Curated annotation (Swiss-Prot):
Keywords: Chromosome, DNA-binding, Glycoprotein, Isopeptide bond, Nucleosome core, Nucleus, Ubl conjugation. It is found in: Nucleus; Chromosome. There is a cross-link at K118 (Glycyl lysine isopeptide (Lys-Gly) (interchain with G-Cter in ubiquitin)). The nucleosome is a histone octamer containing two molecules each of H2A, H2B, H3 and H4 assembled in one H3-H4 heterotetramer and two H2A-H2B heterodimers. The octamer wraps approximately 147 bp of DNA. It comes from the Eukaryota. SUPFAM superfamilies: Histone-fold. The keyword Glycoprotein applies. This is Late histone H2B.L3. GO terms for molecular function: DNA binding; protein heterodimerization activity; structural constituent of chromatin. Belongs to the histone H2B family. The keyword Hydrolase does not apply. Residues 1-32 are annotated as: Disordered. Gene3D superfamilies: Histone, subunit A (1.10.20.10).
Length: 123
């Protein structure tokens, strides 16, 4: 553990970089994926005059990731129990019913069904 704390203290240390070959392109930073734009769109639908801080957005993003992982894990478990190798909308719907309480599950299932219907009709 002390080695990690020591390494964190050497943030500003600079090493000489090897010269790049002339054909190399500048490397791009990996993009951080987030649900931020979708959270913002929903916020504007519900409360058009309300904003959101970057900290609140980060918390909401973590929440969405957590719920997604829980639903995916439960759907995977259900598929495994039924000796299926594919997670279908049926497993996802059952996972949502198991994970979310009462009225929230009903709303989530109806919104999910609506989204799947919209997707299949657009194809």
């Amino acid at each position: 553990m002390p080695a990690k704390a020591q390494a964190a203290g050497k943030k500003g240390s600079k090493k000489a970089k090897a010269p790049k070959p002339s054909g190399d392109k500048k490397r791009r930073r990996k993009r951080k994926e987030s649900y931020g734009i979708y959270i913002y769109k929903v916020l504007k639908q519900v409360h058009p005059d309300t904003g959101i801080s970057s900290r609140a957005m980060s918390i909401m993003n973590s929440f969405v990731n957590d719920v997604f992982e829980r639903i995916a894990a439960e759907a995977s478990r259900l598929a495994h129990y039924n000796k299926k190798s594919t997670i279908t909308s049926r497993e996802v719907q059952t996972a949502v019913r198991l994970l979310l309480p009462g009225e929230l599950a009903k709303h989530a299932v109806s919104e999910g069904t609506k989204a799947v219907t919209k997707y299949t009709t657009s194809k």
